Amino acid sequence: MLYTLMEVTLNDLDKDGNPVKYYIEKAVRRAYRDASSHVLSIEEGKNDSKKNPFIKETAISKVVDEVQNISGDYECWHKHVCKDILMGEIYQDKNVDYKEEDRRFSYGIAQKFVNMTIKYLVILYTVMKAMDTDKANRNYIKFYEKNLKKYEQDFHIPIDGYILESVSKDKAEILKNVIVKEKKKVKAWSKWEENDYNSFQAELKKIKAKDEYPLDWEGKTWIEIAKSRKEKIIYKKLTHST
């Protein structure tokens, strides 16, 4: 499972023998792919952020460093990292005249990058904790328990189409701040500004049970929508074949 998700096994080490940094970087790289694969794809004639590999590597390095040095209030840390990704000079080429249709980093993409990084770090910890047989694993477990575990109730829910679909079915009223009125539909998460994200995330956390971890709620909800989508595809194929 870990190899499929992040191309790691439980005994992996980086070239410097630092398993903690190695595992964090693998999680960050997978999260970057999740956040950018569909909305930052290369296209001729576009000023796309993904065209420059330096941008990608700088962003990944930044998040790896921030995770290793996480401290203080989680909300402040999260906002700081998202803004650094978004507003840092690596994404702000002053010689480029960006247009609305150009696919570049938004706060919506930054949040998914950061939030999926955390989600993958939680997955790594959960698996390693259940299979604690290797020194490299124990080093990562110690890092997580010292630096991240205390924030588990504060972790943000990664916002994507699956979460928006779930909310639109049962709690549509909390989408009011991200509705594009002239189009009468929800703004794509990849286009969200900071205020869009903050207001929605705050409302989203009210949905879960008080003692439920945000990422537990997200995982359960995401799977429900994934199953629903798959069932619709199967039903469509069956009805069209008869």
Placement of each model-derived feature along the sequence:
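Phosphate/adenylate-binding glycine loop and adjacent helical scaffold
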Residues: 1-104, 134-137, 141
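C-terminal accessory module of base-excision DNA glycosylases/AP lyases that mediates lesion recognition
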Residues: 1-30, 102-145, 149-242
